[in-house]
Regions:
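A short, hydrophobic C-terminal helix/tail in secreted or cell-surface proteins
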Residues: 324-329
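N-terminal accessory/interface modules of nucleic-acid-binding and processing proteins
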Residues: 1-323
Length: 329
């Protein structure tokens, strides 16, 4: 593995710190570890440019820890251009920025194309290529750390109002039902289960979820559904994550299984944040928090594996959801 730069090492330490602190807090917070205030998904201010799932996780955790009003962030230079400079002595949060200058064919390593050529491909053809990335660490600041709240209080309050608070119940349920329908049409079946136990059936390629009445809160039902969907992306026929795949008839190691459970909790939590809801650690996995925290702190490579697995899992889900909209389904 390529040696990390000092900036990458510092960023990784900060990312690990934010994740482990949040997981530890969940133990005494009824399992809630992310987006307790129901803020909307992290984005760049003011244009609203989207960010990767892992970056969104770090931005959301940083916002939670510091009590910021929104998950909206900006670069120091961009805030200065808007005459909304970052205030003195503020600490930013690391952002993993990838420069995708070249792309390689997933099935032919000798087929390498430029970014320009990649952008000219159809959405379907683009899926045949993956980026050859060069990672840079940028530093972002929440808009609460800028002069915006002081210089234009009314504008700031309007921005906060538009980016805080869970969706109205009817709209939220419609959003969740739409997501489930798109999963059924494009990724896997999502069915009701009478046994009372959520699970994924590999033979039927279907997720089974108990009725909503079996859960204390609607958000618990939604996140358990998301856990099962994320878990299903790791099976052999999809992303084949280490913790989900038999090799030569041998089951995954205990450590790999525990890491997979962390990926599922983080990825489903990020998706909950995208829907404007708080995320919880499941009761079944609460006992793994100390193990996860120890591994994240002691293994400097684990955070990179987590970033890759979380991004790939949610990209698989999001691409399927997006494709359904593009094809008019």
């Amino acid at each position: 593995m390529k040696e990390k730069s000092p900036q990458e090492k510092n960023a990784a330490e900060r990312q690990v710190s934010l994740i482990t602190e949040a997981l530890s807090k969940a133990v005494d917070n009824k399992g809630v570890w992310l987006n307790e205030q129901g803020k909307q998904y992290p984005r760049f201010y003011p244009k609203g440019a989207a960010v990767s799932p892992f970056n969104a996780l770090v931005m959301g955790l940083n916002s939670d820890k510091n009590g910021f009003s929104t998950n909206l962030y900006t670069l120091f230079s961009e805030a200065k251009k808007r005459d909304e400079s970052v205030m003195a002595h503020e600490r930013g949060v690391p952002f993993n920025w990838y420069a995708w200058n070249k792309y390689v064919n997933r099935h032919n390593p000798e087929d390498i194309i430029s970014r320009k050529d990649y952008q000219e491909l159809s959405a379907t053809d683009q899926t045949q290529y993956k980026g050859i990335h060069n990672r840079e660490i940028r530093v972002l600041f929440n808009i609460d750390q800028t002069m915006l709240p002081l210089k234009d209080k009314e504008k700031y309050e309007d921005v906060v109002k538009a980016n805080v608070g869970a969706n109205e119940d009817k709209a939220l349920r419609s959003q969740v039902n739409d997501f489930i329908q798109k999963m059924k049409e494009n990724l896997m079946a999502v069915r009701k289960d009478g046994s009372g136990v959520a699970h994924y059936d590999t033979e039927k390629d279907a997720v089974y979820i108990p009725k909503q009445e079996n859960f204390e809160h609607y958000s618990d039902y939604v996140q358990e559904m998301l856990r099962q969907v994320v878990s299903a992306t790791g099976h052999q026929q999809r992303l084949a994550r280490e913790g989900m795949v038999m090799k030569n008839g041998i089951a995954p190691s205990e450590d790999a299984v525990k890491q997979e459970k962390l990926v599922v909790e983080l990825a489903s939590g990020i998706k909950m944040m995208e829907m404007g809801m708080p995320a919880k650690i499941s009761k079944e996995n609460m006992g793994l928090v100390d193990y996860w925290n120890r591994e994240l702190k002691e293994n400097p490579c684990l955070i990179d594996a987590i970033e890759s697995d979380v991004n790939n899992a949610l990209d698989a889900v999001s691409y399927t959801h997006l494709r359904a909209h593009e094809t008019g389904r």
